[in-house]
Amino acid sequence: MRTVVIAGGTRGIGGALAARLRAAGDRVIALGSADADLTSVRETAELVGGRLPDRIDALVLAAGRFDMRRVVTAEGLEQTFAIGVVSRYLLAERLRPALAAAARPVVLNLSGTGGIKAGRIHWDDPQLTRGYTMFKATMQGARANDLLGVAFAARESRVRYILYNPLLVNSGMHRQFRQPMRTLVGAAATVAGATVDGAAKPLVTLLDNPPDAPLTALRRGKRVSLSRQEFDTATATRFEALLKGVIAAV
């Protein structure tokens, strides 16, 4: 029996994936907001330190939070950055020993996976204290997670890291928008988007048979070349250093 930890595993794609894995007989630890405050560096560290098993076969990073307003956590971090970037980094890095104890360990990060021209790292203001928009925060997070995958895979490890963008999914995210965008995005998701269960199905296959490469990027199942500038190793190293500074300051 595999042990799978899913951050963001109580609703949306993560919840649908959790249901599929449980039905297949896997032990699933689904982390939602009631289980741990993943916007908090301290709570995330405590979660890793004492509440998760010593062997984890798969770690799925699907937690995220979006808000039209800039929300600051109790630790002074912008909320989207805290849960969508910082917590994912902490979980993957600090669970390395538990993952290494498994036979075929894999990290699956639902991320941007390159090609998002609007996504960029705001090096001088990663907390977006100036000119915050939900779109800007979300796109920075997508870009950041691609870099986290590069940084993780750069260190020799048996753990396979998969970056996966399911593209348009009818997950209800459109409810975060103001009108008329809420109606437009909701209609597009209903017509063209995959259901959360449909989006979860290929993820099961990836967890069952992870690629052999240390890092793989996929956009709705189609491979994305890691030679793209979005996966630049030097940029990933620079971003990880920035992130360590943010965490150390908390």
Language model regions located:
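Rossmann-fold cofactor-recognition segment
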Residues: 29-44
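Short alpha-helical oligomerization interface
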Residues: 68-83
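Rossmann-fold scaffold of SDR-type NAD(P)-dependent oxidoreductases
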Residues: 7, 55-64, 108-111, 162
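N-terminal Rossmann NAD(P)H-binding glycine-rich loop of SDR-like oxidoreductase domains
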Residues: 7-20
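Catalytic loop of short-chain dehydrogenase/reductase
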Residues: 68-69, 100, 104-158, 165-181
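Amphipathic alpha-helical dimer-interface segment in Rossmann-like NAD(P)H-dependent oxidoreductases
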Residues: 49, 83-103, 150, 154
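Conserved amphipathic alpha-helix within the SDR
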Residues: 42-55
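C-terminal helical subdomain
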Residues: 144, 157-163, 183-249
